[in-house]
Each structure stands twice: as C-alpha cells, then as structure tokens.
Amino acid sequence: AQCLVGSEMCIRDRYTDFPETENLIACILPMDTAVFRFPFRIKMQGDTVAIMDLHGMDHFIHLFHYPDLSYITSLGKRGDSPEEMLSVENIRWNGNSLWVLDANGLKLTRFGLALSNDSLLREEAVSLDKEILRGLDFVIYDDSTFIIPDYSGESRFCWVDRTGRLLHKMGIIPTTNEEALKHARPALAQAWRSFIDYNPRNGILAAVTQLGEVLEIYNLKDSTHIVRVGLHGEPEFKVAEGYGIPTGIMGFSDVQVMDTAIYAVFQGDTFEDISRKMQKGDMTDG
C-alpha cells in the first residue's frame, strides 16, 4: 500500500513468511591465534579477511589471509591519541582500502595497502561534521560521498562529503507512531537504529532495524522507497528522560545488498528471553 510518511511517499507492506527458504551449512576453520574479544563483522577483499572486534583490548581490526586464516596484522589501535580510535562501529572495503567508522571519535579512517601488499597503513582521516549525531553505521556511495544514518530523528540519512562536511539529509523515519514523530524524535531515532548496506551496481540502499522487524529498500536511481514490516512490527520502546528504552525484540543485526537479493541476519528474541538466558549463563548468541 502507498502511504505518506511526513512529506515522503513510500510503498509500505507487511510480510508474514518467506516464499522460499534455504538452509546454509557452515564449516569450522581453526585459527592459529586468538586475538578477539567480540568479533562482530567480517569483510573480505580478494584473499584478505578483515575481522572487526567490537570490544578489542588493544586493536579493533585484525587481518587474515583467506582461506587458511593465517594472521597478518592488527590495526585500529585503541586509545585517545589522534591516530588511535575510541571505538569502531563498522568497516568497509573500497578497492584495496579499508574504511573504518569511529563514532566516539567522530571520524572515518582509511587504511591502504602497504608496498609489501600484506598489511594496511593509515592513510587518511576524515573528521565528521558535528551536526552528525553519533553515526553508528555508514556506506560508501562513491569516491567522494558517504551515507550515514541520522540519529537526530530529523531525517533518515545524512549525506557527507570526503572532508566530513554534511551535504544534505534525506528521508524520514517510516513510523506510524505520529506521537513520537511530533514529541520524541531523538528517542524514536534511537529505537529505529538501523544497519545499512549499499550496492552501487544497482543503486539499492537497504536498512534493517536493530529492534522490531522492519526492512527499508531505497532505490537511489529512481527514488523509490519500499518499507516491509514483519510479524514483530515496528521497534517497540518507551521514553525515559529523553532516551528510547527498548521493550520488544532484538531484530536484525546485519544486511547485505547483492545484485538480485538482499540478505539479512535476524534474531527475534524478546528482551525478557535474553534476560533469562543471561541469568542462566546461556550466551550462545552473544
């Protein structure tokens, strides 16, 4: 069904199941080193694997050869000096360069291949405009532009140039919660925190919510915006002292836009279930 979200027209529909399902079988690859505390993202480029450690002690990113997973080096040193990082939210390859988002440090850093071709060196740091409130994900739109979710609640995405300057904002949170849109946009934006991905070959930008079950598909070539809402609905939250406190489920944790399909990782556990598992010491899902 077509709907008007703020001043934006979008196609909104619900889904209850998937017409086709497939089972994936994984194999365990032993590693000769243990450097992780909380491995959260894996990005491949050729025969190099970059693994992001969300809570790294000394470094946030570790490089390995593929397929033998032999250790190469670690980068993204933890610390508060200008060349170190306070946090890492996501990593993205762009050719032979690896871009890294440090939300707490308000910067994007580019690591490029060394002359030996077996390690990465820090080559560029982009300080983000202070109007961008704690960007927690990013995609590379082209060689001069990044797209970062807008957590102010004013819009859906921020377009940022290669110098970190905010170019413009796009879209609006596609919620049916008109009360939150009017009176609690920062809390609404927190609840609608999304993981994003972009495929430059087809112009598709996808966003999936960390809470609830909402998938957004933006076709940046023709400005089409599709919102698909699953059985668990929109992110559920309550407002406490201006913050959005989650009350529903943990939803998606990653999304990948390919040429003919969009893949997303979904959890679906309620916060009550998660609390019970933690009390029992069951941390199978992290």
Q: Which residue ranges define each predicted feature?
A:
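Single conserved hydrophobic/aromatic residue that forms the stacking wall/gate
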Residues: 1-6, 10-11
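A short helix->beta-strand "capping" segment at the edge of beta-propeller domains
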Residues: 13-37
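Surface-exposed loop and turn segments in beta-propeller and other repeat-based domains
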Residues: 24-32, 73-84, 123-131, 167-191, ...
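Beta-strand-rich domains and repeat architectures in extracellular enzymes and scaffolds
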Residues: 28-59, 265-267, 273
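Structural signature of eukaryotic scaffold interfaces centered on beta-propeller domains
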Residues: 40-43, 90-93, 137-142, 186-201, ...
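Asp-box/WD-like beta-propeller blade repeats and closely related beta-sheet repeat scaffolds
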Residues: 105, 113-144, 149
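Beta-propeller blade signature
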Residues: 159-161, 219, 278-286
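Short, conserved, GDST-rich strand-edge loop motifs in beta-rich repeat architectures
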Residues: 265-285
